[in-house]
Amino acid sequence: MLYFRKRIARPTVVREVERTDECITELFQLWNESVRASHHFLAEADIERLIPFVHQALRSVESLVVARHGGRLVGFIGMENRKIEMLFVSPDYFGCGFGRVLAEVAVREYGCRYVDVNVQNPQAADFYRRLGFRVFERSETDGQRNPFPLLRMELVECCNDI
């Protein structure tokens, strides 16, 4: 049984999306809200520097799946080469299980086995550990060579829940 802090009243729709300009704008807005609510180690200037990379990644990542609840975008996950490249959930829906649903889709339907997590984001590292991921390497910089250390994680224990 899954435990969610908040009750989910209506079914969730999870599907791959067509990347229209409108869709990219909606995904970017969710990313912006989620990052500001969860990545407290980033200064405003850091977030501003990431914006062009985020827009590019949303358009170019191999597979992009969204979760909608009651018609509202509540989260998305981007995957490429068996790796989760991005997973963001609306702060209004933190703790509701949407991140887990998206991660399960990534593992089960897209064969994802890897993810990088910021060291300064222990909630994300704990989330992936609960799903069976383990750290196999540490990098002192992120993908843009910024001084934000990363934990490189691999799925090593796949439980029945995922």
Predicted segments with their positions:
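Conserved GNAT-fold acetyl-CoA-binding loop/helix
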Residues: 22-24, 29-55
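Conserved catalytic-core motifs of GNAT/GCN5-like acyltransferases
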Residues: 116-118, 134-151
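A short helix-loop-beta-strand connector motif used in the catalytic cores of GNAT acetyltransferases and
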Residues: 55-65, 83
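A short, internal acetyl-CoA/4′-phosphopantetheine-binding micro-motif in the GNAT/acyltransferase core
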Residues: 83-94, 118
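Conserved GNAT acetyl-CoA-binding A-motif
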Residues: 108-120
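Conserved beta-hairpin
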Residues: 62-75
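Conserved N-terminal entry element of GNAT/NAT acetyltransferase domains
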Residues: 1-22, 159-162
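Conserved acetyl-CoA-binding loop-helix of GNAT-fold acetyltransferases
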Residues: 95-108, 126, 130
